[in-house]
């Protein structure tokens, strides 16, 4: 599926940057029911924002599907793991940037940022 294709791409990019993570399979083995695509073993900062997990979405982020993801997934990830990153590979509505959860609970991007925007601890 296209979703899996983009998850694998993200996995490759994380490995190239030497960012270690647990994937969904591993998290489920540890007993988590709701899991992001990647839970970082050590948090990173992207443009100064702390990121503990990354969720990959191979679609355009519009108001409707973003609202669904918030309710079904993103609030759970934030409650369990703290702030994270959601990647909408095909872009997202700019107005999502001004919602209360964005830049507080997680940040939105259209790809994994370049190395110079990432601080590794």
Predicted regions and their residues:
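Conserved catalytic cores of phosphodiester-cleaving nucleases, focusing on short active-site segments
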Residues: 10, 14, 36-63
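Short, flexible loop/turn elements at secondary-structure junctions
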Residues: 18, 25, 42, 58-60, ...
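Interdomain/boundary linker segments immediately adjacent to catalytic/signaling cores
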Residues: 1-4
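Domain-level recognition of nuclease-like catalytic cores that cleave nucleotide substrates
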Residues: 90-121
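A short acidic/basic microdomain associated with nuclease active sites
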Residues: 11-32
């Amino acid at each position: 599926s296209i979703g899996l294709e983009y998850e694998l791409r993200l996995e490759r990019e994380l490995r190239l940057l030497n960012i270690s993570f647990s994937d969904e399979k591993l998290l489920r083995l540890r007993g988590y029911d709701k899991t992001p695509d990647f839970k970082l073993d050590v948090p990173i900062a992207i443009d100064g924002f702390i990121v503990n997990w990354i969720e990959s979405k191979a679609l355009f982020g519009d108001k409707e599907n973003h609202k669904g993801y918030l309710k079904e997934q993103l609030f759970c990830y934030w409650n369990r793991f703290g702030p994270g990153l959601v990647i909408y590979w095909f872009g997202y509505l700019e107005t999502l940037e001004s919602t209360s959860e964005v830049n507080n609970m997680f940040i939105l991007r259209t790809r994994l940022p370049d190395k110079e925007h990432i601080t590794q601890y």
